[in-house]
């Protein structure tokens, strides 16, 4: 198949995770620095990671509100998806990512006993991994299309 890349898109960072070749597990890769205000989206680094990891599709988290409405961050994630689609011409899917960052922080506190400073360095990468793992577990449509 190839790997899927999961992305947790923020205004200053993008957490990146990739699946294994079978589409069973997700692993955090890194956090790419971006700056929405300056129109710097880290696409050169994403391109390197796409090539290194033989990525065949993207999964982006949509940070919906708890009442299932969409706010500005959902629109920003969709816009980032459009940038990826234009640059890479690879399929893209979205998954509801409500509470993945909260879950990631809880995991880091409870299981890793990580300090606040350490958590800040890895939380977006872990959130991207959770987004992608949830997608893989739900057998998202890209898995069906690419197999």
From Swiss-Prot:
Record-linked PANTHER family: POLYNUCLEOTIDYL TRANSFERASE, RIBONUCLEASE H-LIKE SUPERFAMILY PROTEIN
Keywords: Cytoplasm, Hydrolase, Nuclease, Ribosome biogenesis
GO biological processes: rRNA 5'-end processing
This enzyme's EC code(s): 3.1.-.-
Protein name: Putative pre-16S rRNA nuclease
SUPFAM superfamilies: Ribonuclease H-like (SSF53098)
CDD domains per UniProt: YqgF
Domain of life: Bacteria
Location (main, coarse): cytoplasm
Pfam families noted in UniProt: RuvX (PF03652)
GO cellular component, one term: cytosol
GO molecular function terms listed in the Swiss-Prot or TrEMBL record: nuclease activity
InterPro entries given in the database record: RNaseH-like_sf (IPR012337), YqgF (IPR005227), YqgF/RNaseH-like_dom (IPR006641), YqgF/RNaseH-like_dom_sf (IPR037027)
């Amino acid at each position: 198949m190839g790997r899927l890349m999961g992305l947790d898109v923020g205004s200053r960072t993008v957490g990146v995770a990739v699946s294994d070749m079978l589409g069973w597990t997700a692993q955090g890769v890194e956090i790419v620095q971006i700056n929405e205000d300056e129109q710097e989206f880290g696409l050169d680094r994403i391109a390197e990671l796409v090539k290194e990891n033989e990525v065949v599709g993207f999964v982006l988290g949509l940070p919906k509100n708890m009442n299932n409405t969409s706010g500005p961050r959902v629109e920003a994630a969709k816009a980032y998806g459009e940038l990826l689609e234009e640059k890479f011409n690879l399929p893209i899917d979205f998954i509801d990512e409500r509470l993945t960052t909260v879950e990631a922080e809880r995991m880091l506190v409870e299981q890793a006993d990580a300090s606040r400073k350490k958590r800040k360095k890895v939380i977006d990468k872990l959130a991207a991994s959770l987004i992608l793992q949830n997608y893989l577990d739900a057998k998202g449509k890209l898995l069906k299309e690419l197999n």
